[in-house]
Structure formats: structure tokens, C-alpha cells
Amino acid sequence: MSRYRPPRTAGTPLITPEGAARLRAELHELWHVRRPQVTQAVSEAAALGDRSENAEYIYGKKMLREIDSRVRFLRKRLENLKVVGERPADPNRVYFGAWVTLEDEDGEQARYRIVGPDELDLRNNQISIDSPLARALVGKELDAEVLVRTPAGEKLWFVVEIEYPPAP
């Protein structure tokens, strides 16, 4: 299993269809693949005898607790999420799921997709709808000026392009 993920506070309960599919795939992987593997390893370690000083047994039990915690979180989160896949009535405004191309005062461009907090992925330019930038962008039209207040200070952006993925 990857690194430990502490429980998060629930953000906006929106998610794209792709994000929901990733969470369901993670849940399936944990419950049907990883948990049986770790359970088998714990059973084999327990069969070796003394459990008090059995590092494999102790580590396996810890892994089971982490897997079970993540499974509980995913099940509960998936129940409460609203999948938003349809295009908005006004595609010339920024809403959830939009790819937005921005340009700053120096002419440098950046492109972001507004997604749910469970899908946040800065390497792929996917920002949470709860972020200061996304909150400032939602509802803006093409060519709008957007002043974004972040912990690093204020920055002025211009909305250059708004694009929505095709509906599933």
C-alpha cells in the first residue's frame, strides 16, 4: 500500500465521472486484491508462532487497519458524492468540470481543470473547486478579469478559453 493518508475533511461533494471511476477502482483494488493478499500474509505470519515479537504479523495487522480505514472512507465518500458529467447550460461561463486557460499580465498562460477535492492533481493541472483560484473563476465569462487572492498574494488573470469535456 502507498503512504498513509490521514482522514480528510470532506470538501465540496462534487466529482467528475472520471474521478468517481478512479475512486471506485481504488475501492475495488483495496477490497478485492490488496486486503486478501495482506490477510493471507497475516495468516501465514500468525502460523509461525509467537505474535508479540513477529514483525511481519504486526506490520500486516497495521496494513489491514489502514486498508480498512481507507475502504470505510471511500465507501462513505462515494455515497455522498454527486457525479457531475453533463455540460452546463451556458458553456461560455466557468463551472465545475471546465478546462480554463488563463493568461496573466505578462502574457504567460496556464490551463486548469476545476474538479472535486477528491480529484486534486496539480501535476495534471486539476485544481479543487474549493481552491482560491477555482472559487474566483466559477461563474466568470470568457475574457473576464479575475483577481485571485492566495496566501502568496494577489494575482490578476484573464480568462482566455473555456472548454468542457464531451458528455459521457
Swiss-Prot record:
SUPFAM superfamilies: FKBP-like, GreA transcript cleavage protein, N-terminal domain. Gene3D superfamilies: Transcription elongation factor, GreA/GreB, C-terminal domain (3.10.50.30), Transcription elongation factor, GreA/GreB, N-terminal domain (1.10.287.180). Necessary for efficient RNA polymerase transcription elongation past template-encoded arresting sites. The arresting sites in DNA have the property of trapping a certain fraction of elongating RNA polymerases that pass through, resulting in locked ternary complexes. Cleavage of the nascent transcript by cleavage factors such as GreA or GreB allows the resumption of elongation from the new 3'terminus. GreB releases sequences of up to 9 nucleotides in length. It comes from Pseudomonas aeruginosa (strain ATCC 15692 / DSM 22644 / CIP 104116 / JCM 14847 / LMG 12228 / 1C / PRS 101 / PAO1). PANTHER family: TRANSCRIPTION ELONGATION FACTOR GREA, TRANSCRIPTION ELONGATION FACTOR GREB. Residues 61-84 form a coiled coil. Belongs to the GreA/GreB family. GreB subfamily. One of its GO terms (biological process) is DNA-templated transcription elongation. GO terms for molecular function: DNA binding; RNA polymerase binding. It holds the Pfam family GreA_GreB_N. NCBIfam families: greB, PRK01885.1. Keywords: Coiled coil, DNA-binding, Transcription, Transcription regulation. The lineage of its organism: Bacteria, Pseudomonadati, Pseudomonadota, Gammaproteobacteria, Pseudomonadales. This is Transcription elongation factor GreB.
